[in-house]
Amino acid sequence: MDHLAHYYHAHIDELNRRVAEIVSREALSGLVIHSGQPHRMFLDDINYPFKANPHFKAWLPVLDNPNCWLVVNGRDKPQLIFYRPVDFWHKVADVPDMFWTEHFDIKLLTKADKVAELLPTDIANWAYLGEHLDVAEVLGFTSRNPDSVMSYLHFHRTTKTEYELECMRRANQIAVQGHQAAKNAFYNGASEFEIQQQYLSAVGQGENEVPYGNIIALNQNAAILHYTALEHQNPARRLSFLIDAGASYFGYASDITRTYAFEKNRFDELITAMNKAQLELIDMMRPGVRYPDLHLATHGKVAQMLLDFDLATGDAQGLVEQGITSAFFPHGLGHMLGLQVHDVGGFAFDERGTHIPAPEAHPFLRCTRILAPNQVLTMEPGLYIIDSLLNELKQNSRGKQINWNSVDELRPFGGIRIEDNVVVHQDRNENMTRELGLA
């Protein structure tokens, strides 16, 4: 924690600098950032799991307490309005007492609807950042999530401070332990549901604490890109395992994927080829490189794999240009990572939010930025046997270039994805996932 405390001081200085610049530019008194409010289930008295506003989490690791507020202007000491009601029904959050508290003036709020008494009196000159625009309107905010402020903050959130990088290393370190436990569970015969339980136990986080719903897919389920069903019964035959799962640390996410074959076979060789390709793509990352160019390079590598494993005929360039590789690799190479799994700013050209669209032939690419130091991105190439996409190839002449017998052999295995979390530095790449022990 000593390292975090040291880095945190500079982190707060940077956030204050950003706020000072944008509020001066927009002639605002400052920003009021709302952690959020509970959401109640329809016709019930139970709330959905609470998720704090990422703009709130950027300042401090208060992740599970609704009705909190930050008042910041970039000049004065940030003010934290911390919700601590008198409540005998629920666990009430303890008064904060961690390394970060010295950087805030903390005021306690006992009743959520009395927050106006603690907010600035000239509230119309402050901008509200948060989800609950109806609450902001009642409180008197006239500027609510202004585009200019949001675009500025989102653009700069892609540049991580040392504090943020350290949090993400720790999120990776935790997730690596979970991945190792899940791998062992797979080879020991566990079901998807059982693998999930062993993963969560290893990371020490519940389903609502990990940053996203884990993908635990055996066999053909690996062909479903966002598979979260978790079957309780084991398949009749154990062939393959794809796990896409992360962990959280102080609000920052890791997002890691591995694929395993149960036996040494052709599918296992394809995993080895994909692993080699993924590492080669990571070696291509450096400041000044356009992320879409890395995505296009991935399609070239997927095309070569289709040829090498007798899944398609022709030449690699032709397979890419005809969209054949997109049927086997339909998603983007990766995305920005940070406070959110699919972090903001991935399409921003500048502080004004000028949008860089994804290439027309690759609409699912989630990042079009030019790489720069201290950005963190996922690198997650894949190859899948997805019947709905391959059936489209069958409907025209492109289907003649597919070796359908080879495709049929791989169909029961579902697919492959390998994903690492990578920091772009000025003179090197830091593959957090690999460097923290996950092969």
Swiss-Prot record:
Q: Top-down, what is the taxonomic lineage of the species of origin?
A: Bacteria, Pseudomonadati, Pseudomonadota, Gammaproteobacteria, Alteromonadales
Show the InterPro entries listed in the entry. Answer: Creatin/AminoP/Spt16_N (IPR029149), Creatinase/aminopeptidase-like (IPR036005), PepQ_N (IPR048819), Pept_M24 (IPR000994), Peptidase_M24B_aminopep-P_CS (IPR001131), X-Pro_dipept-like (IPR052433), X_Pro_dipept (IPR022846)
Q: Which residues bind Mn(2+) 1 per the record?
A: 255, 335, 380, 419
Give the molecular function GO annotations: aminopeptidase activity; metal ion binding; metalloexopeptidase activity; phosphoric triester hydrolase activity; proline dipeptidase activity
Residues at which Mn(2+) 2 binds: 244, 255, 419
> Any idea what job this protein has?
Splits dipeptides with a prolyl residue in the C-terminal position.
Q: Which Pfam families match?
A: PepQ_N, Peptidase_M24
Top-level EC class, please?
hydrolase
Q: Which domain of life is it from?
A: Bacteria
| GO terms for biological process, alphabetical | proteolysis
PROSITE patterns of this UniProt entry? PROLINE_PEPTIDASE (PS00491)
UniProt protein name:
Xaa-Pro dipeptidase
